Amino acid sequence: MVCLKLPGGSSLAALTVTLMVLSSRLAFAGDTRPRFLELRKSECHFFNGTERVRYLDRYFHNQEEFLRFDSDVGEYRAVTELGRPVAESWNSQKDLLEQKRGRVDNYCRHNYGVGESFTVQRRVHPQVTVYPAKTQPLQHHNLLVCSVSGFYPGSIEVRWFRNGQEEKAGVVSTGLIQNGDWTFQTLVMLETVPRSGEVYTCQVEHPSVTSALTVEWRARSESAQSKMLSGVGGFVLGLLFLGAGLFIYFRNQKGHSGLQPTGFLS
């Protein structure tokens, strides 16, 4: 550790801590002792539920697989030369092999039954939105984006249609993206040149819905969009005036209700 005397106690302390961290890292970097990473990975592969199950017990050394047990084979097999003596030794132990073969039922099928309700049977509806990647006039090259998010399981089919006809050319996808919360998302984009009056539809099929989800995007010219916005603005303004008029009317009615002609009983 190197300590330099500088004015100001806090600066000296900060510099001292920094130098201590640096010196510890340098000391660690100077340690030339070999380090190894050993990893064991157990896998269950299911086909058509539990109709066919495959169990794998895999062993890795420094991220390289060197040995595995495969229930389809029934014994250990060396993947590299490093695993050959281990495979020969373990294959000679009949009790160990019987135990590993039994993992298909007492490990894989058992855990499938425990987790089936919240894994295999889990269903979450997708959320679908459609929008252009760029805001620009019609008859210019653009990218229409169909965003499908928050769905489970990951099996999904997304299609693009233009005026009712499926578009296959110019369709690109990000593929499945894991959200980290047991849901997925994907973006499926259509390269096209939108023209006024055209209707683009993104159709999504997913196990969580009984019928396909469809979201439309209509190509409108700037003048049509301006007219639509003007119409919406006029409608909202009319509602505001109507609300203000009704408020004034009912307030006046309430004020007059307290004045009654002489002689009437209330």
Curated annotation (Swiss-Prot):
Effect of residue 37 to S: In allele DRB3*01:04
Region described as Beta-1: spans on this chain: 30-124
Intervals, Cytoplasmic compartment: 249-266
UniProt-reported outcome of changing residue 57 to E: In allele DRB3*01:03, allele DRB3*01:09, allele DRB3*02:01, allele DRB3*02:02, allele DRB3*02:03, allele DRB3*02:04, allele DRB3*02:05, allele DRB3*02:06, allele DRB3*02:07, allele DRB3*02:08, allele DRB3*02:09, allele DRB3*02:10, allele DRB3*02:11, allele DRB3*02:12, allele DRB3*02:13, allele DRB3*02:14, allele DRB3*02:15, allele DRB3*02:16, allele DRB3*02:17, allele DRB3*02:18, allele DRB3*02:19, allele DRB3*02:20, allele DRB3*02:21, allele DRB3*02:22, allele DRB3*02:23, allele DRB3*02:24, allele DRB3*02:25, allele DRB3*03:01, allele DRB3*03:02 and allele DRB3*03:03
Compartment(s) where it occurs, according to its Swiss-Prot or TrEMBL record: Cell membrane; Endoplasmic reticulum membrane; Lysosome membrane; Late endosome membrane
Cross-referenced InterPro entries: Ig-like_dom, Ig-like_dom_sf, Ig-like_fold, Ig/MHC_CS, Ig_C1-set, MHC/Immunoglobulin, MHC_I/II-like_Ag-recog, MHC_II_a/b_N
Family, per entry: Belongs to the MHC class II family.
Record protein name field: HLA class II histocompatibility antigen, DR beta 3 chain
Source species of the chain: Homo sapiens (Human)
